[in-house]
Amino acid sequence: MERYESLFARLKERKEGAFVPFVTLGDPGIEQSLKIIDALIEAGADALELGIPFSDPLADGPTIQNATLRAFAAGVTPAQCFEMLALIRQKHPTIPIGLLMYANLVFNKGIDEFYAQCEKAGVDSVLVADVPVEESAPFRQAALRHNVAPIFICPPNADDDLLRQIASYGRGYTYLLSRAGVTGAENRAALPLNHLVTKLKEYNAAPPLQGFGISAPDQVKAAIDAGAAGAISGSAIVKIIEQHINEPEKMLAALKAFVQPMKAATRS
């Protein structure tokens, strides 16, 4: 959890926002997936948001569903994902690592056991995409017991009560949703919602990172100009993996070429 605090403090000092890429662990296979993560970090990623392949991803658009299918085709299991997480943590001791999950994967393990496993692997945060704030108590309590930040999604239509709950329960960062719907770079993010950012600050919420539909540097800049602490990009990155699926070296070069200008856009 503390890794997020250190990161945001460091970035604030440098007058920068955070650029956070999302990929699915094990896509397109374990070895290449680890190389992808190294390439993202080398190109300037400030933190990582990682998915564990799951058979029924509700909030994911087709791009990320395909990533899940590729990981399944490579035979990747949740247990192997945790081995990967431990390797990533060993190699990159300071970068914040977040998981984007679905509740079934947490239930399969047992809630407490799942968060204990996260702590052991060096995971900093977990966002359970299909658990609404009002049902989150067992998840967030287990998370805090194991020094894992519970992350909450702040939707564009959040009312005051929800904003207060998110501010009160969330740690690490707040996932600020650009718009409702499924993920995807085709659906470009609408401009960030300044009033939400203002309210979240007022209620002392964890720093907001804007996600969903972030696929170009100007959107990263717009998110930060509106007061977000940074931006998360997933589908646009996963699409690059898909486009270069048979050219592993080209894939890594293309990922770096995408991340560098996205990170550059976080510098005021």
Curated annotation (Swiss-Prot):
One of its GO terms (molecular function) is tryptophan synthase activity. The active site is at E49 (proton acceptor), D60 (proton acceptor). It catalyses: (1S,2R)-1-C-(indol-3-yl)glycerol 3-phosphate + L-serine = D-glyceraldehyde 3-phosphate + L-tryptophan + H2O. The alpha subunit is responsible for the aldol cleavage of indoleglycerol phosphate to indole and glyceraldehyde 3-phosphate. Pathway: Amino-acid biosynthesis; L-tryptophan biosynthesis; L-tryptophan from chorismate: step 5/5. This is Tryptophan synthase alpha chain. CDD domains: Tryptophan_synthase_alpha. Tetramer of two alpha and two beta chains. GO terms for cellular component: cytosol. It comes from the Bacteria. Keywords: Amino-acid biosynthesis, Aromatic amino acid biosynthesis, Lyase, Tryptophan biosynthesis. It is an enzyme of class 4 (lyase). The keyword Transferase does not apply. The lineage of its organism: Bacteria, Pseudomonadati, Pseudomonadota, Gammaproteobacteria, Enterobacterales. The gene is trpA. InterPro entries: Aldolase_TIM (IPR013785), RibuloseP-bd_barrel (IPR011060), Trp_synthase_alpha_AS (IPR018204), Trp_synthase_suA (IPR002028). It holds the Pfam family Trp_syntA. Its EC number is 4.2.1.20. Belongs to the TrpA family. The keyword Lyase applies.
